[in-house]
Amino acid sequence: MEHSHKLLKQVIAAGFALGLAHGALANEDKITKGYNSMDAMGCMLVRECTNDVEEVYSLLDISSQYDNTEEFTPIAHEFNAMLLEMNRIGIKVYLADQRYFPIMHRGVYHTVTNNVYLNKKYMDEPHVLMQLMRHEGWHAAQDCMAGTINNSMIAIIKPEEDVPMIWRVMAERTYPASAVPWEAEAQWAGRTQNMTQDALESCARGTMWTDYDPTPMTGEWLRENGYID
């Protein structure tokens, strides 16, 4: 699909960038190219590597992993609300060991298996966790905008001109040019309270295309594929 169509076929919607230390465990025989590689992440994403990859059922499953558990209290309501909507849609969230993530990755949403994976090494700061959960949750909502989460397509939700310039510039400095439209609005959502929550609720209700006007090219694609009249 061409970039101008504002639909992106991809296997991975990558998360925030940050330097990553290396880990090791001897029993991941499915991984042939070492830890902290795309190969290692792929093994996790398709659920062939599950050691130290734990499903998150509430914020406490994450906050209890760290000494500063009480510092997570202010984000509990929004986090748990997003998690609930993700689960309603069919998306699971996992907290995973750093060895499964390539260098510069804090988290990932997988558009094929529809799961979110959070890098345990960096989730000890509540604001980082919340930004990442919103960011990857927005990618899930983009998946929904493209017709259904049961495909490997994502579509932008907001008109590009509505995205504040600061987030577009940040995306341009961080991601390949072809990914900027999707990542710019995900950066925006990552730092905006309830923006992702609202989109996930819309997806769960089945009102995505009435709550948010599809872009012209997305609308054309949705009509061609029978999602809207």
Region roles according to the model:
Residues 2-12:
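Bacterial N-terminal signal peptides that target proteins for export
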Residues 11-19:
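Bacterial N-terminal signal peptides
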Residues 13-14, 24, 132:
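Cleavable N-terminal signal peptides
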Residues 25-35:
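Cleaved targeting-peptide boundary
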Residues 27-28, 39, 43-112:
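Auxiliary, metal-adjacent structural segments of Zn-dependent hydrolase domains
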Residues 116-133:
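Short pre-active-site segment immediately N-terminal to the catalytic Zn-binding motif
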Residues 137-154:
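Catalytic Zn2+-binding segment of zinc metalloproteases
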Residues 151-229:
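Metalloprotease/metallohydrolase-associated module, dominated by Zn2+-dependent proteases
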